[in-house]
Amino acid sequence: MENLKLKMIDFTGKSENVVSERDMIFSFNNGEIKIYLSYETGELKKIEIASENEKIEKEIEREAVLKFKGNSVILDYEYGLYEYVEIEIEDKLEKYWADGKIVYLKEGKKIFLEIEIWEGYLLFFDDEYRMAGFGTESKNRKK
């Protein structure tokens, strides 16, 4: 994660001089992952795990919530208009093994950005920062 570089995305539609360095946030289980980026360079500054009691969505004016549920991942997020995404593995995703990871990727999508949102849980985005898939990391994979 230390070398992760991103283009800055203005999720809130604000102008450059009022956008804060807080760019993305994922809620997972009873906590949040905050991802801080530099507006000027797009480089990752730090990642924090916050308690569920913090009022983060008010602070950053947007929210992304990820839920793993059986063979699906559900991602709710605000991006201009509210968008709801639910992916069923059996119907829409291709499964791969890559570098000790199980990767579920939407057909025809390529991974531009990988973010570990929780230990061993990964989200993948395409070059338009739309979710391309998700995966899990297996450090002790049996061959």
Labelled PLM ranges:
Residues G31-I33, E43, R130:
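Short acidic/polar mixed-charge low-complexity motifs
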Residues D23, N30-E32, K46-E54, K106-I111, ...:
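Secondary-structure transition/turn motif
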Residues K34-T41, F124-D126:
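Hydrophobic alpha-helical segments, especially N-terminal targeting/anchoring helices
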Residues M1-E21, I47, E52-V103, R141-K143:
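Intrinsic disorder/low-complexity detector
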Residues F11, F26-F28, F68, F112, ...:
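Phenylalanine-focused residue identity feature
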